């Protein structure tokens, strides 16, 4: 069985001497690190500009996963963004406040604040504020989906974070293995039939604990917050185009979450604006190599190019 270490990496982009592959940044000459979009140390974004091409650049805003409680903007989840740089996109990798210090919905507010910050400074860094795209995996996939679903104003807008008057609207969203519906998730995971009994039990326990921590509720008792924190709750015909990528053997977030999400979106914004990319045999992002390999990343970037 292939693991992340078995991915078809670009050698100069990754350090394989560590236990878990780590991205390398030496090939990027134009870097602006730890740009602050808020008062907390984790409210920061790293910005990288392409080596070639003329500004203003379309911009990929990347939001890492990690169960809302861990990982960082310079972890391996940034690696797909290196392909975006090569293809002429600027890359912005975002940190956000983590559980338990910060719970729903502050992570959503943070991502929106980062978008507003980047738009407010677009001229300074050579970014095209009309061509911003979101990319997130796992918990990051949930966050970018929430931002996309609520980008035109809702109770989750987060107030006037970022430069006055800037919109957090984006041109398109790539959601990789996203959690979409918190109400149905546990029952869907219970019905997964491709896990061993021991692994199935462990995944149910882990999932229950992650969501309880994120919402600040007792484990197994998410209550009304589960609906309030579900992407489905906010979907309208104003949603941006989506590229949804998911593994058919995901052990943490069942692929039915992506399938149902794509179906709802197609009914609201039209089938031509929604791509559902199910990767046969792939497990959860971060454990399977497919999501960081060139063919699967370029398919997303090609979709984004059609939206420019």
Where are these regions (language model features)?
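Alpha/beta-hydrolase superfamily serine-hydrolase fold, recognizing
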Residues: 1-308
């Amino acid at each position: 069985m292939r693991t992340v270490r078995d991915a078809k990496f670009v050698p100069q982009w990754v350090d394989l001497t560590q236990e878990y592959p780590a991205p390398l940044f030496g090939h990027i000459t134009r870097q602006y690190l730890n740009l602050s979009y808020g008062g907390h140390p984790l409210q920061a974004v790293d910005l990288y500009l392409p080596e070639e091409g003329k500004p203003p650049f379309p911009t990929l805003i990347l939001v890492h996963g990690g169960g809302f409680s861990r990982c960082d903007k310079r972890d391996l989840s940034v690696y797909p963004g290196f392909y975006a740089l090569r293809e002429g996109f600027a890359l912005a990798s975002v940190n956000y406040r983590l559980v338990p210090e910060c719970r729903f919905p502050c992570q959503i507010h943070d991502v929106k604040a980062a978008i507003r910050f980047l738009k407010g400074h677009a001229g300074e860094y050579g970014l095209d504020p009309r061509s911003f795209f979101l990319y997130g995996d796992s918990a990051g996939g949930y966050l970018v989906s929430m931002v996309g679903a609520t980008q035109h104003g809702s109770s989750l807008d987060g107030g006037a974070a970022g430069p006055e008057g800037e919109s957090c609207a984006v041109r398109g969203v790539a959601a990789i293995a996203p959690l979409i519906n918190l109400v149905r998730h546990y029952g869907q995971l219970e019905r997964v039939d491709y896990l061993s009994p021991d692994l199935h039990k462990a995944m149910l326990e882990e999932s229950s604990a992650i969501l309880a921590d994120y919402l600040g509720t007792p484990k197994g008792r998410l209550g009304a917050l589960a609906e309030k924190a579900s992407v489905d709750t906010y979907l309208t015909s104003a949603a941006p185009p989506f590229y949804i990528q998911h593994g058919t053997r995901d052990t943490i977030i069942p692929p039915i979450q992506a399938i149902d999400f794509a179906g709802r979106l197609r009914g609201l914004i039209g089938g031509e604006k929604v791509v559902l990319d199910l990767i046969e045999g792939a497990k959860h992002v971060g454990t399977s190599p497919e999501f960081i390999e060139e063919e699967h990343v370029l398919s997303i970037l090609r979709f984004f190019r059609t939206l420019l």
